[in-house]
Amino acid sequence: MRLPKEGDFITIQSYKHDGSLHRTWRDTMVLKTTENAIIGVNDHTLVTESDGRRWVTREPAIVYFHRKYWFNIIAMIRENGTSYYCNLASPYYLDSEALKYIDYDLDVKVFADGEKRLLDVEEYERHKKKMNYSNDLDYILKENVKILVDWINQERGPFSQAYVNIWYKRYIELKNR
């Protein structure tokens, strides 16, 4: 599979552990690809839910996916500052159809003022039982929550305002070509 290039548009598909399609984002612009990571941007991107409902993202958001970490990061650029929505999820897989990952329900939200919240713990526990998450998977996900919180606290990668500014500026340059 050829890696997408800067300026290409890709589809993103999230699945649940049982293989069911959860959500699809159409036309995410790729800003950078490396052997292990893809950085992109969603800006007024069409999102389709598994039940067929559709909506459009409200603000530009830098998205970060990695082949080794069990999370992905969405940096939402808003008037009052950058806030983050982080999905605990499998490392991504890329094929000719889309960038794909499994969403494991647990989420970390970081507000523009720095407040952090772990979300959807009950949903995670419910799906863990229903979809038979293994003990190994449970351990991996909980360890990756710790890694993610360390990244947040250290303002590493996507959690650095300089990172967000650089990639947003690059998006504007590509958009205005």
UniProtKB/Swiss-Prot annotation:
Keywords: Hydrolase, Magnesium, Metal-binding. InterPro entries: DUF402, FomD-like_sf, Ntdp-like, SA1684. One of its GO terms (molecular function) is magnesium ion binding. It is an enzyme of class 3 (hydrolase). Mg(2+) 2 binds at residues 105, 107, 120, 123. It comes from the Bacteria. Pfam families: DUF402. The active site is at residue 23. Its EC number is 3.6.1.15, 3.6.1.6. Its cofactor is Mg(2+). It catalyses: a ribonucleoside 5'-triphosphate + H2O = a ribonucleoside 5'-diphosphate + phosphate + H(+); a ribonucleoside 5'-diphosphate + H2O = a ribonucleoside 5'-phosphate + phosphate + H(+). Mg(2+) 1 binds at residues 87, 103, 107. PANTHER family: PTHR39159, UPF0374 PROTEIN YGAC. Belongs to the Ntdp family. Has nucleoside phosphatase activity towards nucleoside triphosphates and nucleoside diphosphates. This is Nucleoside triphosphate/diphosphate phosphatase.
